[in-house]
């Protein structure tokens, strides 16, 4: 595995740090997000990153808020709270930044988004990684980029297993002009195709392989079922990772299409002593 990844992972055991699981069914969700050297997020002294995790700790009540299958406990939802200027909004901005970079490339103004608490950070890489549960399997995708120089220096996609092992699907060490394909992406016939695409950007610090593999590659995915993990991860980030800001309206109001849910919303608002201007009871 490339050296740039700094996340400590825990395998399933008898401790409370149960992280890995192979889920039954088609669950899709964000498990963890890690970031460093971005806006207010400095590199930790030990070289790690700031982490947002949906992994549940010891739960004694409100168990209906927890998803578990006997191996892993995950929060169905989470809230981030803290003092003013503590970095809450920057966490959302970091997730949104990573999403936009994956889908569209580095956005305007990115060269100034490194953490400025230390002048040395200007030349240090910024780190972004998401762990997701996708179709019963657990993946980590991430990249490192020196924002001030608009240069990606590494990129990776790995499959995570319950025995604390990682199966490399692809890694790129752009600084040393090297890459590695593994797992289903190393399948005979497919690997030769991917070698061409990966080789073209072997030392290109301006491009992410995941984005390239989702541009006009319909024939590849039709011919190689194993290649679809690249399409599916990209599709999850594009279609399922929905990031909203406080001043941004939420477009999906399906929750309110059910009468009982609408009544529940009304009761909650009333409990705060806020009049809706019209009593509602269906």
Q: Where are the language model's segments positioned?
A:
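Short, positively charged and aromatic/hydrophobic N-terminal segments
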Residues: 1-27
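Pre-Walker A-like glycine/lysine-rich segment at the N-terminus of P-loop NTPase domains
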Residues: 20-97
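Residues in well-ordered beta-strands of folded domains
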Residues: 34, 53-55, 131, 144, ...
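Short acidic, glycine-rich loop/turn motifs
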Residues: 35, 40, 130-136, 159-161
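Short acidic/polar mixed-charge low-complexity motifs
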Residues: 48, 135-139, 166
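Conserved P-loop NTP-binding catalytic core
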Residues: 66-79, 83, 92-150
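A broad, structural surface signal
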Residues: 89, 93-96, 100, 263-270
């Amino acid at each position: 595995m490339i050296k740039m990844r700094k996340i400590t992972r825990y395998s399933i055991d008898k401790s409370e740090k149960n992280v890995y699981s192979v889920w039954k069914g088609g669950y899709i969700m964000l498990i963890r997000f890690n970031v460093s050297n971005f806006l207010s997020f400095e590199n930790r002294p030990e070289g790690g990153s700031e982490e947002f995790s949906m992994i549940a700790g010891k739960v004694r009540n409100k168990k209906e808020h927890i998803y578990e299958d006997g191996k892993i406990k995950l929060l169905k939802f989470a809230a981030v709270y803290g003092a003013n200027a503590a970095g809450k909004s920057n966490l959302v901005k970091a997730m949104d930044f990573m999403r936009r970079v994956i889908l569209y490339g580095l956005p305007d103004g990115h060269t100034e988004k490194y953490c400025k608490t230390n002048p040395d950070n200007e030349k240090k890489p910024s780190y972004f990684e998401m762990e997701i549960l996708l179709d019963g399997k657990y993946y980590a995708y991430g990249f490192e980029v020196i924002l001030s120089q608009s240069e990606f220096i590494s990129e990776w996609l790995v499959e995570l297993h319950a025995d604390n092992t990682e199966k490399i699907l692809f890694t790129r060490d752009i600084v040393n002009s090297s890459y590695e394909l593994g797992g289903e992406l190393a399948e005979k016939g497919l690997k030769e195709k991917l070698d061409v695409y990966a080789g073209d950007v072997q030392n290109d610090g301006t491009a992410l392989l995941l984005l390239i593999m989702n541009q006009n590659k319909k024939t590849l995915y039709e011919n190689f079922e194993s290649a679809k993990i690249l399409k599916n991860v990209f599709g999850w980030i594009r279609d399922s990772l929905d990031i909203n800001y406080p001043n941004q309206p939420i477009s999906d109001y399906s929750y309110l299409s059910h009468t009982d849910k609408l009544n529940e919303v009304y009761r909650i608002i009333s409990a705060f002593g806020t009049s809706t201007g019209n009593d509602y009871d269906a």
